[in-house]
Amino acid sequence: MAERKPIISFRNFSFQYRAQKRPTLTDINLEIYPGERVLIAGPSGSGKSTLAGCINGLNPFSNPGACTGTLTVDGVDAPHSSLFELSAHVGTVLQDPDGQFIGLTVGEDIAFALENSCTPQDEMYAITRHAAELVGIENHLGYAPHELSGGQKQRVSLAGVMVDQVKILLFDEPLANLDPATGKQAIELIDEIQKKTDTTVLIIEHRLEDVLWRNVDRIVLVNGGTILADLRPDELLSGSLLAENGIREPLYVTALRYAGVDITPDKHPAHVDSLVLDDTDTQKLRDWFTARPRPAAQPEREPLLEVKGLSFGYQKGQQTLRDVGFSIGKGEMVSIVGRNGAGKSTLSKLICGFETPDAGEIFLNGKPLAEENIRRRAQHIGYVMQNPNQMISKTMIYDEVALGLQRSGLTEEQIREKVEATLRVCGLYPFRNWPISALSFGQKKRVTIASVLVLDPELILLDEPTAGQDFRHYTDIMEFLRGLNARGVTVVMITHDMHLMLEYTRRALVFCDGRLIADRTAAAVLCDPALVEQAALKETSLYTLANRCGIAPAQEFVERFIEQDREVREGGC
């Protein structure tokens, strides 16, 4: 039998960026074999993106640096090759699909690489059509990129790299900008493509539970520029390495730990549906549920933000929001959820005054906001956009965060104290004198959050506040927001992160096709399968676990878990 040869091989490999004093990767030894599905996980700054950049050639050809050791990619000596040559072996799907579009239509974008290689037109059309069919986008070849949803854009990006018939597909945080249902479909698509083509698949992602919706062969855990673990999912989830290195384990695994269940590889904890629980394990969960008190009822609150009969459309005859009405109380922490294109971001623009409603009114502290201009609204409502590049206007991190305080009447010393305190909370203090251009997408996101939080607004409205964040920075940001909320600041978050919704907000507003279809507790939303499907959300694995163990009502199981999780985060039992 012939010896199996790796398609990717790192041997004693180190990489140091030209602008850095120390190597970002140190003594990497890793082999990945043809047809494998490998998840590369690690906290922000761990080196996982640098590792991926060495595989696809971005390092050192676009990001100059020095390599030692060897790296072979599909038989090619990667550090001594070229970006062009490596692109014939490795196809990369970026975190932000908008950054990968080149053509004016879907068809043109998919065919771009074929045009560069002077492929005959008839052959080009056939290959483009086949790639589009493979990813299920064949009916959109004439569409412009802006006419596509986030999930459709990602499919186009995938088709664009598959026309080269690459042997390796690398996905850089493929779930970061997708709603839960579309993210689930993305993982299913990656799994389907891998099975059809036997392509080697590498996924860089923070959202471990979502990636494990479909099987992966191994999880490579990276931190501090080294590989800490290279294990099967069942093995890694049985230990404590994930939590120790800032990676969130699946919620059902945490629930089992709270109940005192011993998690071992033979219980197959990689997916809630494959989980093997004996009678003793099930009884431990039931006993834990019985022993936990019901969460206290939430008090009635004086309204802060009131929306009444709100309707809006960007074009005549097309309504993005239809007759939306709700009230948010002072000191509440609320999630706004729903599929991409449901109207969530449009609602935030109307609240901030960036757009004017066609009908309806918005009130803050009982006063109509229509009488306030954008500048005056901003004194009360802080808004953090989803895309940090659309907010940043300064070159340096410190200057960006301090910008809003320049006309506040504070002294330079007072400004410095406020800015540095906020930077510490957001995990940016070590980078305070860095240029923003040197930051990752996730780090830029933290800069924009810091620039709003430093102003102490009455209400903070955040569009995807934790997108691209590892669990440690996610927790730092959310605990900071929770601390503000505990002091009476109202926090409203537009999010695709169902964990965030459950863990930090007791109430969720659910949107679908421009309408508010539910206003319920977060647990109630994710324990309603019909609502979950309608709004393109994702059932929590806690709901599945409760049903498997015969614990009813499942919603109370979820609520009691979340309550204990809050206690643990706050240093309780």
Residue ranges and their predicted role:
Residues 169-172, 460-463:
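Catalytic Walker B motif of ABC-type/P-loop ATPase nucleotide-binding domains
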Residues 64-76, 360-368, 377:
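Conserved ABC transporter NBD signature motif
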Residues 56, 352:
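Helix-to-loop junction immediately C-terminal to a conserved catalytic motif
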Residues 41-43, 337-339:
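The feature captures the beta-strand-to-loop junction immediately N-terminal to the Walker
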Residues 122-140, 413-431:
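Conserved ABC ATPase "signature" region
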Residues 226-252, 515-542:
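Conserved beta-strand-loop-alpha-helix hinge in the C-terminal portion
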Residues 144-148, 152, 435-439:
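Conserved ABC ATPase signature
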